[in-house]
Amino acid sequence: MEERRLFKPSIEYTEQIAEYKAEFSPEQIRATYDPDRIPGMDYLENYNSIPEWLCFLDTVKGKITWHMSVWMSDGKIIGFCCLRHKLEYDDDDPDFASNVGYSIRPSERRKGYAKEQLRLVLQEAKRLGMDHVRIICRDINIGSNRTILANGGKFVDAIYGEESGMTVHRYDVPIS
């Protein structure tokens, strides 16, 4: 497996970010808790352009950190992730709050990249002084459930969202 690193999204990656986003169909997003968002790219749907979204990212520095996981050999974006420094920042029902959101480009799935990307995000959380993170995923998202468990996630519970009609699994992941 080639080396991947996390990079902060920037204007230089505008075209690659657009290509990444375009690869997601409604069917692929439906497996997530919020079917209007691509995980790890929160709030992109609220902006008319990627540069506008990048400006938004600057406004939440210190609360949320976004990263792209990138192939070092060719600069291809294989994943996006965000690390929410505090659960109370989440604007949804607090029971459904999550410190981490992530996605892998559909054409690059089932290759172990999500596991590696989450490992890198946990290193970033440790650097920020966090001792654990809470992560949620839909009960039907087998890949995400496995990724979280592979990174030391401890199953907390399954909760049903009355408004969304979805069941999610909640995990706590200790950071060592």
Where on the chain are the PLM-derived regions?
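Conserved acetyl-CoA-binding loop-helix of GNAT-fold acetyltransferases
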Residues: 102-104, 110-123, 127, 146-150
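Conserved GNAT acetyl-CoA-binding A-motif
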Residues: 125-136
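Conserved beta-strand-loop-alpha-helix junction that forms the acyl-donor binding cleft
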Residues: 135-145
